[in-house]
Amino acid sequence: MPKSEIHPKWYPDAKVICNGEVVMTTGSTQPELHVDVWSGNHPFFTGTQKILDTEGRVDRFMKKYGMGSANSATSKEQKEEKDSNK
């Protein structure tokens, strides 16, 4: 005889939340799913370049390999852009 009630509760209208707002609904075993990145703000889908560093990994990599910080890389690009506009 199979065991009864061994499967988790299924929520057919689970809310996916990104940055405090509901971005979509889906089926899940959790009533709410909190995400940092989704297709609406991912650089691949939006066409923008943005460094998302929630745990300091990019800065740690830049320091380890002597490349400065992630912010200095973007500031160099902005400085070059200003110089080319003159």
From Swiss-Prot:
Keyword flag Cell cycle: no
A GO cellular component annotation in the UniProt record: ribonucleoprotein complex
GO terms of molecular function: rRNA binding; structural constituent of ribosome
Biological processes, Gene Ontology terms: translation
Keywords (A to Z) from UniProt: Ribonucleoprotein, Ribosomal protein, RNA-binding, rRNA-binding
UniProt feature, compositional bias: Basic and acidic residues: 76-86
Positions of the UniProt region annotated as Disordered: 65-86
Top-rank taxon, per record: Bacteria
The protein's assembly and partners: Part of the 50S ribosomal subunit.
Family per record: Belongs to the bacterial ribosomal protein bL31 family. Type A subfamily.
Function of the molecule: Binds the 23S rRNA.
Protein name per Swiss-Prot or TrEMBL: Large ribosomal subunit protein bL31
Origin species: Prochlorococcus marinus (strain MIT 9312)
Lineage summary: Bacteria, Bacillati, Cyanobacteriota, Cyanophyceae, Synechococcales
